[in-house]
């Protein structure tokens, strides 16, 4: 059985590697062409375009891993079935259960690799790509309204809430366009702080540059409220928001790890903010490596198809269509779940469960009746 395992794994892994390399080459070319639009602007050269495309590769590999596994495994198994190698292995004692177990073990190994790439390598690459673009673009802008953060301090009648708006980040990583609104327990605006830029220290203290502070005394009448204004070149503003939470609000979701997504979702929940999108993203990222097991199970029935059921190229084409349909269903489930407010883990797990049931049903039917 060790020889059988070595034979199967060698062919499957080499096929998966070839498919992954082909996909990565295609996506690298597309990203490189896209980066060429900014060459010549603010000192950006073609080498920066090439480097930016390289930084995107780990993220593409993470997204393409299940599809590459499906296509590569189908190609290897279909080729073995057409050359009667798989038939010889079955005659030698490779039963359906044992074949499924061998592929499941290989799928588990690829699931671990996918998790490592998605949680450690891809976020670093995405952050480096964002930093490279921000350096030549003069900063990173966060949508039209910027990024919003909320914070609560105190308790009971002394509770105050803070709404923080960030326009984006500068080329050096400093926060830009900072606006901080403080409200009392009755929802009245107590103070407003605006600053050109600022940085967040590890202890949560914000160092604001060119800060303007406006205060409205809560005891005064609305029409006669004296406004106190103060301008400071440097202002230290204490906060309970960690640098990780601030970074999560400003940077794209692709730069966040599974743990960071969970922590940010918990922060949003504690501040009574919408968490559905981030919870769905967390569960999709947490369960995505399991798609490798599903793709292995989905590829196995192709080994039990008779050679007359189609050539290897036709079966590979079928695998490509299955992979595309899985990606479409996975993305569609996320958008529909967000619109319909479905349970996040159900939204993330449904596509993989459906394709797993489909693969097991096809595998059982082929083993019994073919």
Name what the model sees in each region.
Residues 7, 11-15, 98-111:
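Start (N-cap) of specific transmembrane helices in multi-pass transporter permeases
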Residues 73-87, 92:
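Transmembrane helix boundary and interhelical loop/hinge segments in multi-pass membrane proteins
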Residues 40, 273-365:
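Transmembrane alpha-helical segments that form the functional core of multipass membrane systems
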Residues 90-95, 340:
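Short helix-to-coil transition segments within interhelical loops
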Residues 244-270:
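Extended, hydrophilic extramembrane loops/domains of integral membrane proteins
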Residues 1-59, 181:
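Hydrophobic alpha-helical transmembrane segments
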Residues 57-77:
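Long, hydrophobic alpha-helical segments
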Residues 47, 107-223:
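Non-transmembrane, extracytosolic/lumenal segments of membrane-associated proteins
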